[in-house]
């Protein structure tokens, strides 16, 4: 009995000591996203413990835990309206819950090669974190091409990701599509926030395969109050 009591006292002391060594830090991870996370007092680079990410409206889009700098256990992802849209288990690398985000401006399409197959069973690739969070990790309206902002009609903007059969991002481009303006800009995949790289691969008949996952967002150029500036609406009014 005494040994049991001593064990629990020691365990509680260790947990208290660990908590005392943790501090909260804050870092901007994208133009409109801020990450709040716990680290060791003496090593701010390694995340330990709780973490959550908020948008410019201070709405929480992601929440989970880190262990030794890696995502651990269950992470929850939310829409901009606060609805739970995805749950992912990083310990077991398993998608537990995933529903369409009805409130996001981001639409999705995917491309999977099924040439030569008869009635294949195709499961589209999935962005871990959801489309809305994944898009805003990379989007900054200040980086829109001047030629796009100078157009007189609305433009479809596509973020096209090449996803490997293991779920790795192998390529990334931004395409602008309209009647008179059609351009593809290849993007570097180096030094992005780590969440931007996280995908679940597509499958064909149960086998993981390469694919393309595409975010689609309309740029309502015709509604811009200051034509030619970076202030281009992504919502139709």
Report residues per predicted region:
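Charge-biased low-complexity segments
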Residues: 24-237
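Bacterial Sec-dependent N-terminal signal peptides
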Residues: 1-25, 237
């Amino acid at each position: 009995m005494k040994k049991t009591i001593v064990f629990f006292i020691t365990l509680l002391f260790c947990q208290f000591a660990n908590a005392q060594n943790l501090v909260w830090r804050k870092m901007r991870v994208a133009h409109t996203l801020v990450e709040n996370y716990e680290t060791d007092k003496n090593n701010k680079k390694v995340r330990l413990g709780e973490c959550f990410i908020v948008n410019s409206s201070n709405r929480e889009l992601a929440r989970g835990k880190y262990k030794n700098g890696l995502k651990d256990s269950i992470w929850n992802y939310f829409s901009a309206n606060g609805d739970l849209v995805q749950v992912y288990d990083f310990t077991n690398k398993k998608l537990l819950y995933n529903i369409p985000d009805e409130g996001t401006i981001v639409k999705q399409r995917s491309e999977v090669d099924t040439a030569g197959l008869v009635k294949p069973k195709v499961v589209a690739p999935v962005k871990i974190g959801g489309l809305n969070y994944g898009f805003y990790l990379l989007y900054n309206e200040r980086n829109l091409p001047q030629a796009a902002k100078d157009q007189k009609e609305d433009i479809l903007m596509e973020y096209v990701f090449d996803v490997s059969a293991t779920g790795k991002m192998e390529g990334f481009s931004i395409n602008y599509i309209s009647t008179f303006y059609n351009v593809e800009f290849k993007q570097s995949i180096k030094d992005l926030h780590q969440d931007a790289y996280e995908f679940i691969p597509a499958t064909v008949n149960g086998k993981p395969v390469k694919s393309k996952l595409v975010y689609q967002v309309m740029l309502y150029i015709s509604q811009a109050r200051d034509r030619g500036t970076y202030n281009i609406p992504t919502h139709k009014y």
